[in-house]
């Protein structure tokens, strides 16, 4: 048993070290801790039920040695002084006390003897004294119904032979209790680690975190805390209380007959069980206690199932909200892309407008340099349009007086050019123009826009070279003609060469 305890302790310490080196997720640890609590509660109830069953069916005829407390001694007399002395009894008692590894959970039975070594008569009830080992607070003694009346042994009288009165000390702790202490310490360490881990996370995370609600407590509700309502077939409702049964086995207690008559439709009670006043203990107490334990553990699991369902629903709500946010984000991105396309179109329109502004400014510059001369003189005074003013919208474009340009090229002013005969207006106008503004007649012997007349100038030679280069003649003939042109001297020879070249090109 000691080896098993040491094994469990070592495993617990290894688990604690591993948890300190690599902390687990708080949710996983809480689930493991809840499962461990349910398992430990089930094991404790199983041990209690097994101890009670063993105490009921144990043969109490086996004698056991008493356990002496620390620092005190207990003396017992042997049954036969002739064969067994007090020294042998003391040796057996000392051997029992020295063996600290022997711890029995069985029921102990004691015989009462007088000082002479004879068994005391009339104390049959003393045989039913029971000592429960394994308790921490001491030994509890149960006696028979007539123990205080029939017993002749007085614990307060001193022993005439000088022996000290027997002092029954507390029995050592059972291995099962020690094992549960180790598990309790292990659970406390795990809880401490969880608290430290949560404190560190709260200090490190300053932003928003998802706070998981704590696991609801698994305390059993009392009869006064949770009133419930039960529906019936009629309109009235009856209030009741919800409480768990403390008994693990036995018969159903009889219920008192109600004094009130039924106010609604009757309910069938064919499957109701008959009540029993007395029930003998059965061998299936362990099974019943185990069933009750499983029911209790199942009732403890139900709040955790509700908690898991709530947590699952919260997670689903969060997922739905995230999906909706994703969809909204996609819509926003689509609209932003359309805005970017519109921005490109707007930029192209702005570029076109800037180009048009440049062209308009260029046209305005050209118009500002124009001088449009609108003749305003020489009109018939009887003409109804003679006194009509110029369109005011055209004044910035015209920029000059209507008769200013004409007055500058005439010899006489406009006041002196009034003619009575309208038929002679054109002849008089020609004579009135200044000589330097009059056009000269076209001469046939000089070059003009009508024809080309070569002379001995360099310009004439350049024109002939251009005619030869732009012709459809071959390269050899072009080179030959160019060499002849270079050898020609004088205007007459150049004119003859030009006539010959024209004939060659026409053919």
UniProtKB/Swiss-Prot annotation:
| CDD domains reported in the protein's UniProt record | MEV_P-protein-C_like
Q: Where is the composition biased (Basic and acidic residues)?
A: 189-199, 222-233
Q: Which segments does the entry list as coiled coil?
A: none
Q: Which UniProt keywords apply?
A: Phosphoprotein, Viral RNA replication
Bias type Polar residues, positions:
279-301
Where Phosphoserine occurs, the residues are 86, 151
Residue numbers spanned by region Interaction with the nucleocapsid (N-RNA): 459-507
Mention any Pfam family matching this sequence: Paramyx_P_V_C
Q: Where is this region: Multimerization?
A: 304-376
Region annotated Disordered sits at 56-79, 137-307
Report which superkingdom the organism of origin falls in.
Viruses
- Compositionally biased intervals (Low complexity): 236-252, 266-278
- Tell me the Gene Ontology biological-process terms attached to this UniProt entry: DNA-templated transcription; viral genome replication
Where does this protein have compositionally biased stretches of type Acidic residues? 137-160
Do the record's keywords include Phosphoprotein?
yes
Q: Which GO terms describe its molecular function?
A: RNA binding; RNA-directed RNA polymerase activity
What the entry lists under SUPFAM superfamilies is as follows: Phosphoprotein XD domain
How this protein is processed and modified after translation, per its record?
A: Phosphorylation on serines by host CK2 is necessary for the formation of viral factories.
Let me see what the UniProt entry remarks about domains. Answer: The N-terminus consists of a long intrinsically disordered tail. The central part contains the coiled-coil multimerization domain (PMD). Forms a four-stranded coiled coil structure. The C-terminus constitutes the alpha-helical domain that binds to the nucleocapsid (N-RNA complex).
Describe, as the record does, how this protein assembles with itself and its partners.
Homotetramer. Interacts (via multimerization domain) with polymerase L; this interaction forms the polymerase L-P complex. Interacts (via N-terminus) with N0 (via Ncore); this interaction allows P to chaperon N0 to avoid N polymerization before encapsidation. Interacts (via C-terminus) with N-RNA template; this interaction positions the polymerase on the template for both transcription and replication.
Q: Record's family?
A: Belongs to the morbillivirus P protein family.
User: What's its job?
Assistant: Essential cofactor of the RNA polymerase L that plays a central role in the transcription and replication by forming the polymerase complex with RNA polymerase L and recruiting L to the genomic N-RNA template for RNA synthesis. Also plays a central role in the encapsidation of nascent RNA chains by forming the encapsidation complex with the nucleocapsid protein N (N-P complex). Acts as a chaperone for newly synthesized free N protein, so-called N0, allowing encapsidation of nascent RNA chains during replication.
Q: What is this protein called?
A: Phosphoprotein
The species this protein belongs to is Rinderpest virus (strain RBOK)
